Amino acid sequence: MDATALWQRYLEWLYYHPELGIYLDVSRMRFDSAFVETLAPQFAKAFADMAALEAGAIANPDEHRQVGHYWLRAPEIAPTEELKTEIVETLEQIETFAAKVHHGQIHPTRGGLFTDIISVGIGGSALGPQFVSQSLAPERPPLDIHFLDNTDPDGIDRVLNRVEPRLSTTLVIIISKSGGTPETRNGMLEVEKRFKDAGLNFAEHAVAITSYGSKLAQIAESAGWLAIFPMHDWVGGRTSELSAVGLLPAALQGIPIREMLHGAKLMDEATRVPDLKTNPAALLALSWYCAGEGKGKKDMVVLPYKDSLQLFSRYLQQLVMESLGKEKDLQGQVVHQGIAVYGNKGTTDQHAYVQQLREGLNNFFLTFIEVLQDRQGASVEVEPGITSGDYLSGLLLGTRQALYEKQRDSITLTLPQVTPLTVGALIALYERTVGLYGFLINVNAYHQPGVEAGKKAAAANLALQKQLLRILSQEPQPISLMTLAAKVGAPEQTETIYLLLRHLAANGRGVSLQGPPEQPDRLLVRATA
């Protein structure tokens, strides 16, 4: 397609949101009008399914749950007065709590103001808050935030050691819907121990975000924590950023949360329009479907050309892959759906993997995210008439052109600035796109059975570890792995048994391995004191 035809295609498919100042360009995706026509019935059904979801239908049939994250920024559309009241009151409680912390009405036991936050959560309870913090937190926030988003002991120590000098003025937020998420529970216990060792009462620094009546809620209530905020069963972790999960940490950092909610609400209104060409989420869903033939055949590369949006690709990775990566469709047929997502930031990635994108396997489509405003204030000219921001813009446009010349498809999403309004809109845009695409390919985008399978396998391995230690404590002499596996009645799990014991031995945990490390089948195992 020549330059004139491309310009006409750009004009035909360009979307612009006047209140948000957001542009969406899908002209470099290679679909035609005939292809769009074939999808018209599927889009009509997807629009109807989305309307039913917002009206309170059971949109997560596997867990028999409603899906209500859209109600969070428009309580008036919640299906009951009770839900509407709960949403409004929770937002007010978040704002009141943050204001009291900022003004010292809620303060550390030893006086003064809280200076830091440790946020303990995993998955959606971490990725959204991390993305929003990096993109929107002021340079000097009222509280600095630190995240414990894994059960890695070394990683936990790094965060706690960094905060140690200010532990007495640190607020801790524990985020877990059930209260039983092992990684979050482990983080909570590690932090609690550090507070105890410092002579501090953990409860006087702790806040819970959890579901009503959960294990975590019971712990927080009985210990007298500072506050408990709700996690609703109709909000999934990966769509929870505009619930208490994301709004409380944001408010404590001084981020205007109502502006985020307003941006999301404006985008929700735009993406409710049941017309493909004037609905930005539908345009994105169409592009995804076209790129991967509705089967996820191509990866999604996300390149924000703005440092403050660097974590957006990680946030999208969970939102897209956990929602759409499904073995079966809604009728139980095996389909193996999904879209792989990766990315970092431009122009950094132009010096990393863009070489392969242009000249290697054509197994992807790319989303450029452009921000029009370079910075607050004027820029230095690095060449006559040219600024650093001009280079950033020029490199984006150049990469887009270079990829298109090699038959590589791309989408360009343009924001006027990175603000609470546009970040809220960005979150809402992709939440809706994932929902529409899920309906197009007929999968449940709101559950995650694969994650649960991994949790069950991990629990079984830890139970096996306890059994191994018990048997070894009764053995007077070293025994072989095969013998030990037979004694626990699991000869088929010899490899797992070896890997568990190797980890215990490396950490001095009551086990020693004798023999050549490169030949595990010849090792002898014994208990140590």
Swiss-Prot record:
Keywords: Cytoplasm, Gluconeogenesis, Glycolysis, Isomerase
Residues forming the catalytic site: E322 (proton donor), H351, K455
Gene Ontology biological process terms from the UniProt entry: gluconeogenesis; glucose 6-phosphate metabolic process; glycolytic process
Gene Ontology MF term list: carbohydrate derivative binding; glucose-6-phosphate isomerase activity; monosaccharide binding
Reaction(s) catalysed by this chain's protein: alpha-D-glucose 6-phosphate = beta-D-fructose 6-phosphate
InterPro entries according to UniProt: G6P_Isomerase, Phosphoglucose_isomerase_CS, SIS_dom_sf, SIS_PGI_1, SIS_PGI_2
EC number(s) from the headed UniProt entry: 5.3.1.9
Domain of life assignment: Bacteria
Claim: Isomerase is one of the keywords in the record: yes
Similarity-based family: Belongs to the GPI family.
HAMAP family the record matches: G6P_isomerase
Protein name: Glucose-6-phosphate isomerase
Species the sequence originates in: Cyanothece sp. (strain PCC 7425 / ATCC 29141)
Encoding gene per record: pgi
